[in-house]
A protein has these predicted regions:
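Compositionally biased P/S/T/G-rich terminal and signal peptide-adjacent segments
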Residues: 61-86
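Non-cytosolic coordination micro-motifs
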Residues: 20-64, 88-183
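Sec-dependent N-terminal signal peptides
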Residues: 4-17
Length: 183
């Protein structure tokens, strides 16, 4: 009986380690890293609606209204050459009327994700960018994949932009590409 309990404890412990090391266990709007965009849209719909803001065409993105009431907006990215349209980035956004609520939401989600992934996040960082203030925390996985929880506080002069809370799931390769200034 003791051996059975010891084995059970080891198995359960191992499951939490593997869960913490795999970003694909987390879903945004029932979408996860590695799943196919073709499960939602036809190739024609994807190609007609993909974003054109990247100069470097290694990856492509598409944005659409959330499939659930949890988010306002969803953005996903895939390697342009991938005929299966496997997602390498899944981002959910919730528009914010009060930026302080957004900052509180970062703290709430940080606690939930710390427990879910069993990973300690980075310190909260804020820095100005050309559009306003960007505040975020990251959950970094051993694989190099990353979850970013953030708030964009846009300056008043950008009246076409609304402050937004975002959760982004990104693979290591996609993050590396984003950091190479593909715009």
């Amino acid at each position: 009986m003791r051996i059975f309990i010891a084995v059970l404890v080891l198995i359960l412990s191992f499951q939490s380690w593997t869960k913490a090391g795999d970003i694909s266990d987390f879903k945004i709007d029932d979408l996860s890293i590695g799943s196919s965009l073709l499960d939602l849209f036809s190739k024609e719909e994807i190609e007609e609606n993909k974003a054109t803001y990247y100069k470097d065409k290694t990856y492509s993105s598409i944005s659409f209204a959330s499939l659930t009431e949890e988010y306002d907006q969803i953005q996903v990215s895939w390697k342009t050459s991938d005929s299966e349209y496997k997602m390498v980035d899944v981002t959910g956004g919730i528009y914010q009327d009060d930026i302080n609520n957004c900052y509180n939401k970062i703290d709430e989600v940080k606690n939930d994700l710390t427990e879910f992934f069993n990973i300690k996040p980075t310190k909260k960082i804020s820095f100005p960018n050309p559009f306003g203030l960007y505040t975020y925390i990251n959950f970094n996985f051993n694989s190099g994949d990353q979850v970013t929880v953030s708030c964009y506080d846009y300056e008043e002069k950008y009246e076409n932009y609304q402050d937004i809370f975002r959760i982004a799931l990104e693979t290591k390769d996609f993050r590396k590409w984003l950091n190479s200034d593909p715009y």
